[in-house]
């Protein structure tokens, strides 16, 4: 498990052994689990976004494009 990105708005965790990502929208309180081809494309796109403009604002904007995939409520234990 690798924390790839963390801001006030989003949290992204990579699970390399599974080839998957978990993306959490902290404001909406929802998360999405990406695996397979979707995870591969997401990882490549995220790496490119980080390389082009690694500011929190630009990365949060990029991650906002994936809000529709985040459908699972986040629960705090």
What do the PLM-derived regions correspond to, one by one?
Residues 1-77:
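Polybasic/polar functional segments that serve as interface/processing modules
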